[in-house]
């Protein structure tokens, strides 16, 4: 073939490619590259296995049997001993024919399929009061030996350990099984879940907390009147307008002790009977409906009306002073006396009692200015503030009160307390309508309450 013919063939090939470009790209393009078919893969594996088993026409090294006088290794001339007797001999194939007699790959005949069964009241012959045996049962015999529940969704497990159940355990009743269950951490008094008609609550059984908390206590030790439900009446919400909306505090279920409140009393609403020694019943009354505190009544009787404390101008009448109840040291018995805030409150309480005996006008507000060191707390000389003045730079929050009607009078009890430990609510220093607390005092009291 001369050069001219080669050039013509090349031109013809180029012309053919240009005319059939789309078909060629579909057949030989990059998109057609994929894995070989299963048939090709099977043929390749068969060729490879024949090479490794010595049954092909090609031996090691790639030499053929028809290579002439080249010295090669003849596999048929080797000894035909099996490799199990410790002798190096004939090469044995690593493959095994699947349809060849008894050499099919299968499970070990020693391994049996077992199922774990648990009598949960599903079997007719075994209930809660008879033979609650649990364990593994052998299914190789193909027959039910009477100790197995034929559950449709039973899971067949292989290689599972077989637990031997003695005859005594098979005859054990549930009453004697409680001790064994309690030692393993299970609840022996737990009852199975039963469907109940929610539309008819009268038929519901009483709730027993031990069934849900797993305390291991027998049912007869718990009375039917026992209730572990949270009393919703004891949960109350306390907030203030000067705080963020998301900082809400709740009382816990232990809120059964006393609590102090701030009572809004205007001078003209003072009862004349309170001067004569009759205690004001609205002061010291707890929100939970408890009895009136005796010690608050005794201290309240000391503060009587004074001629010098008459009505003032109209601006003061619009904002009546808030009468502060005395702080009690017993409210801080759980927090410790080393807290600087507690020491300040105790000092303030003692000064209030002394001032009530000396001055003719009862004090309404006290301002405590704390220094950097909490041990060197000093009280400002001009601590007594009038009702028409407030701390500079602090906004006056709106009071949220609950009106309590008694006779013809209506008084607002402002919930300005904050919880401490043991469910007690303590009045913060400066938490009044015209005397809001600073941010530092709020953070300190929040830490003490937590």
Swiss-Prot record:
A single GO cellular-component term on record: host cell nucleus
Protein name: Protein W
Keyword Lipid metabolism in annotation: no
Protein's UniProt keywords contain Phosphoprotein: yes
Region Disordered: start-end pairs: 53-92, 265-324, 384-403, 429-450
Basic and acidic residues biased stretches: 63-76
Effect of residue 304 to A: In strain: Isolate NV/MY/99/VRI-0626
Domain of life: Viruses
Comment field (misc): The P/V/C gene has two overlapping open reading frames. One encodes the P/V/W proteins and the other the C protein.
Motif (Nuclear localization signal): 439-442
Stated consequence of mutating residue 206 to L: In strain: Isolate Malaysian flying-fox
Effect listed in the UniProt record for changing residue 378 to K: In strain: Isolate NV/MY/99/VRI-0626
Gene3D superfamilies: 6.10.250.2490
Gene: P/V/C
Biased composition range(s): Basic residues: 438-450
Coiled coil: none
Compartment(s) of residence: Host nucleus
């Amino acid at each position: 073939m001369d050069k001219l013919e080669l050039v013509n063939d090349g031109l013809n090939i180029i012309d053919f490619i240009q005319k059939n470009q789309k078909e060629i790209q579909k057949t030989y393009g990059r998109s057609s590259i994929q894995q070989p078919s299963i048939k090709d893969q099977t043929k390749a594996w068969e060729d490879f296995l024949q090479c490794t088993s010595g049954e092909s026409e090609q031996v090691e090294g790639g030499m053929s049997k028809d290579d002439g006088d080249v010295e090669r290794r003849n596999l048929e001339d080797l000894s035909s001993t099996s490799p199990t007797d410790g002798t190096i001999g004939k090469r044995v194939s690593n493959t095994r024919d699947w349809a060849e007699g008894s050499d099919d790959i299968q499970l070990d005949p020693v391994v049996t399929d077992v199922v774990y069964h648990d009598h949960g009241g599903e079997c007719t012959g075994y209930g809660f009061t008879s033979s609650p045996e649990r364990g593994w049962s052998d299914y190789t015999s193909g027959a039910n030996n009477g100790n197995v529940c034929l559950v449709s969704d039973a899971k067949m497990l292989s290689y599972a350990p077989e637990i031997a159940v003695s005859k005594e355990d098979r005859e054990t009743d549930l009453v004697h099984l409680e001790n064994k269950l309690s030692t393993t951490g299970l609840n022996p008094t737990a009852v199975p879940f039963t469907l109940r008609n929610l539309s008819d609550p009268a038929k519901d059984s009483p709730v027993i907390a031990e069934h849900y908390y797993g305390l291991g206590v027998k049912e007869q030790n718990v009375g039917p009147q026992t209730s572990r439900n949270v009393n919703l009446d004891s949960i109350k919400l306390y907030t203030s307008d000067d705080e963020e909306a998301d900082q809400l505090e709740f009382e816990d279920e232990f809120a059964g002790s006393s609590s102090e409140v701030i009572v809004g009393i205007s001078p003209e609403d003072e009862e004349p009977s309170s001067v004569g020694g009759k205690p004001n019943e609205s002061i010291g009354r707890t929100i939970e409906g408890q009895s009136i505190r005796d010690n608050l009544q005794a201290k309240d009787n000391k503060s009587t009306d004074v001629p010098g404390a008459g009505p003032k101008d109209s601006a003061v009448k619009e904002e009546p002073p808030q009468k502060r109840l005395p702080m009690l040291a017993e409210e801080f018995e759980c927090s410790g006396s080393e807290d600087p805030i507690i020491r300040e409150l105790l000092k303030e309480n003692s000064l209030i009692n002394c001032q009530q005996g000396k001055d003719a006008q009862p004090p309404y507000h006290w301002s405590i200015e704390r220094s950097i060191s909490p041990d060197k707390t000093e009280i400002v000389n001009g601590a007594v503030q009038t009702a028409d003045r407030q701390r500079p730079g602090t906004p006056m929050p709106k009071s949220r009160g609950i009106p309590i009607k008694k006779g013809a009078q209506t008084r607002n009890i402002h919930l300005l307390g904050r919880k401490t430990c043991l469910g007690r609510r303590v009045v913060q220093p400066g938490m009044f309508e015209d005397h809001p607390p600073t941010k530092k005092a709020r953070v300190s009291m929040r830490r003490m309450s937590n």
